[in-house]
């Protein structure tokens, strides 16, 4: 039995050694697969992190851009508001001139207008009371008709009218006035 026992022990030892080799090989392959999976996961995580950072940067940039545009709109709106106030103030100053200054401006405007001998000047009720005699003395025909204008006049030649009221002049020259006011105020 001695030989048989030795042979059995040897078979068992060989089997244990072979089993250990198989286990070591399997463990080595498993470690390789785990390491490979970890590397892949880290690469994907880095990729997702970069992507998330890029998306966050894009969102932040979009937010900043939106805020910048909103600020520009508010600034532009405020500038427009200031310009409108300047134009309104200019119109009010024209309307609140002393009588002799207002009269002089109206006379200068009439001289520069296309007023001829066959035309007549239409004024507001207020201006007709204060300017009719002055204009008549200068040989300017004042119409019996009045218009609802706050300042200035209308030149009437038959059926054709040329509107020199302050409202009409400001409306026509609004863009030019805005440009000048903007240069003065914002440069």
Swiss-Prot record:
GO molecular function list: ATP binding; proton-transporting ATP synthase activity, rotational mechanism; proton-transporting ATPase activity, rotational mechanism
Organism whose genome encodes this protein: Clostridioides difficile (strain 630)
Which superkingdom, per the lineage? Bacteria
Question: Quick one: a GO cellular component term?
Answer: proton-transporting two-sector ATPase complex, catalytic domain
Protein name per its UniProtKB record: V-type ATP synthase subunit E
Record's InterPro entries?
Answer: ATPase_E_C, ATPase_V1_Esu
Similarity comment text for this entry: Belongs to the V-ATPase E subunit family.
Print the keywords alphabetically: ATP synthesis, Hydrogen ion transport, Ion transport, Transport
The GO biological-process annotations, alphabetized, read as: proton motive force-driven plasma membrane ATP synthesis
Q: What does this protein do?
A: Produces ATP from ADP in the presence of a proton gradient across the membrane.
Q: Top-down, what is the taxonomic lineage of the species of origin?
A: Bacteria, Bacillati, Bacillota, Clostridia, Peptostreptococcales
Designated gene of the protein: atpE
């Amino acid at each position: 039995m001695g030989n048989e026992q030795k042979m059995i022990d040897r078979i068992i030892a060989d089997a244990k050694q072979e089993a250990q080799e198989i286990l070591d090989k399997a463990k080595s392959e498993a470690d390789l697969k785990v390491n490979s999976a970890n590397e892949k996961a880290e690469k994907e995580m880095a990729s997702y992190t970069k992507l998330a950072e890029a998306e966050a940067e894009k969102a932040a940039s979009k937010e900043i851009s939106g805020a910048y545009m909103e600020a520009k709109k508010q600034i532009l709106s405020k500038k427009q508001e200031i310009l409108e106030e300047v134009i309104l103030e200019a119109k009010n100053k024209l309307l609140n001139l002393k009588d002799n200054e207002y009269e002089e401006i109206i006379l200068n405007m009439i001289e520069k207008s296309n007023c001829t001998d066959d035309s007549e000047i239409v004024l507001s009720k207020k201006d007709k009371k204060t300017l009719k005699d002055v204009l008549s003395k200068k040989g300017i025909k004042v119409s019996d008709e009045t218009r609802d204008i706050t300042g200035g006049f209308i030149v009437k030649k038959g059926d054709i009218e040329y509107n020199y009221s302050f409202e009409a002049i400001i409306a026509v020259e609004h863009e030019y006035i805005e440009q000048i006011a903007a240069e003065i105020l914002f440069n």
